[in-house]
Amino acid sequence: MDQNNENKKIMPLRYNEKTWLSGRIAETTGGFASHRGAQAYCLHFRGDGSAVWTVEAARQETFDLKLAYFAGKAAARVTLRLGSQTVCQVFPPVNGYASQQIPMRDPAMMQNPEDCESVEVVDTLTIPEGIREIHLQVETRGEFRVFYLELIPRSAKAAIEEKEAEAARLRPSIFALAQKGYGLFIHWTARTKPRYGEMLPYEEAVNAFDAERFARQAEEMGAQYVIFTTNHGSEAFPAPLTAWNKYHPGKITARDLPADLITALEKRGIQLFLYLHIPHMAGFPSDYGTSFNFTNTAMRDTAAQSEICGRICEMLEEIGLRYGEKLAGYWLDCWQPMVLKYGTDPTEQVYKAAKAGNSRRLTSFAFGVRCPTCTPWQDYACGETRVIGMLPKEGRYAGGQSKGYPYHSILVLDDDWWHDFYDNPIADPQYSADQLSDYIRGCMKNGGLVTVNTAVYQDGTVSPKTMDVMKLTKKRVYA
């Protein structure tokens, strides 16, 4: 490699699959362009600015293009330039889920959703062999973010489209579950705080967790299913898994809490999904900034990507075979670094491993609150929407982050996902039972799935105020 290029991030182009150029690997070259904070994986513009991606082409190829972006209150004019080739297009604000949101009462508590989308670019780029630069110029009067530029090789386009059609054919339908009612998302982890006093050590908390009481509580709240976190913010898993212990020694428990939850919930007709945090499961940094703070050598190390996916598959297969058909689904968090760091999508392998023991197990890969989904290999949208917003259209998202995917939205009812404060009560519900029930009924009518995230204390109990709202919601939804 040329010495002048050794400090750049240079993405090798693929010719039998898509290549993703994340905003993170672009070099900012002028104006109001930056990488910042929780959005470190994208390019952030607060006015006109420019950047450049560097790619390595093994041969000349023509690529179709898609740009994943967010536009604030004004459209942006985007120009892509490669040598003498120029592609110009205006990208307007996206009209998706967030355009009809009921904002959080306290925006500082967490991020309100924003509408981002992956949109086809009107023209192509022909990239000659060698190290090449794709220049990006953004003209905007407001805020504009570029998450990634997607390159689809013309020579393999038909095969890529057939693979995406296969992924769609393999999806189990969520319609029956959506028609039954809503679910609960419960962030109970090694970080969840008690109402009073100090936390129990993790394994003690697992042993003390009352699965029967938890299941009764879920039933009283009207849940048809529960998404239960296992390792959010932690490498611990609440069961004696051999593969997990292999990669995270000592981070398992003697008690099999998911098995006990399945038994208690099943008696009440409630299904169990498991949440898994991919960064901690895979053993790479969990926060976006650190996950994307990589070298050119690391970015090009697809062998490392394969090794990580192999570990994930091994753990998923053990979990899936252990719980079989009684484990209804997965919600796999923070998947975007696996695609956007390496520029290639390994999701198919992991998706198929997630079906071990239950070919109908519903599986979703989360790309964060503000990044368009870039894999066809999932059964339902992760739906990290947080607030009430646009209803589904024929069971799918009509626009925005998850456009075209089976509709699933998660509402954060009280605390910011989990209860993280000592000697403090869980926050009051931000939505009334009327607001919740109207939205849930609207989604059920249109084939969409809704999950309500309610914080719990370390003993697994919700706040009395949250329980009151959910009991009334249950009464109105199922009347």
Predicted features, each with a name:
Residues 2-59, 66-479:
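Mature catalytic domains of secreted/periplasmic carbohydrate-active enzymes
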